[in-house]
Amino acid sequence: HAHEAVVAKSGAEGRKGRMATTLTLWMGVWPNFYLLQVGDSRYYLWRQGTLTQVSRDQTIAQDLVDQGVMSRTAAKRSQFANVLSSALGADEATPVVTKLQSEWNAVHLLCSDGLTKHVTDERLAERLTAMTSAKELCEQLLQDALDGGGTDNITIVVGRAVPKDGE
């Protein structure tokens, strides 16, 4: 219904072009969690000192990388790096749902491309290694993105599943 709502809102505002947006949603239902993603906002999992990008950017550049037509390095500089191949409200909206096993103390990082355009995975890992609180991590990453140019909206959400006392 989210896709239809964005399409309807775009039509109601009489826009010449269509409105579109990305979505990355994390939901925990112990002992699993679910990731729903459309677009190029990302989900990273940080556990045992390892950062893993679980989501896949739904961009034309990433499609070309997947097809072996373009390297990852070239994709970052490509004119297609920010051209979405799937988005809510666009002609094509292909949500990807991933089911993963929950793990106590793993850190979940959801972010828009406004962060990942300006902050490398290596820098994300450095910040996660030194993390003392989710709030502080978000503030540091936001500042890193702004210092790197801050050319897009920047959204950062960090969470961790922690057992109750006695579990």
Model feature map: region roles:
Residues 1-167:
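PP2C/PPM-type serine/threonine phosphatase catalytic domain
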